[in-house]
Curated annotation (Swiss-Prot):
PANTHER family: BETA-GLUCOSIDASE, BETA-GLUCOSIDASE A-RELATED. Its EC number is 3.2.1.21. It comes from Aspergillus wentii. The active site is at 12. GO terms for biological process: cellulose catabolic process. Belongs to the glycosyl hydrolase 3 family. InterPro entries: Cellulose_deg_GH3, Glyco_hydro_3_N_sf, Glycoside_hydrolase_SF. Keywords: Carbohydrate metabolism, Cellulose degradation, Glycoprotein, Glycosidase, Hydrolase, Polysaccharide degradation. This is Beta-glucosidase A-3. Pathway: Glycan metabolism; cellulose degradation.
Amino acid sequence: AZLGFZGFVMSDWAAHHAGVSGALAGLBMGSMPGBVBYBSGTSYWGTNLTISLWVNGTVPZWR
């Protein structure tokens, strides 16, 4: 709410390229779910962000 906006922030189709730093900057949702590269099994918002939130505490729960 630094700028007074209290709504939901969502990226454009595959426009985000970071998980933790994007979440900490205020991104609430990436618009295109799925893998970073086709059928790679890795994603910016999937497992890595979950680990950062629940396992190592990199992303605070309030974010």
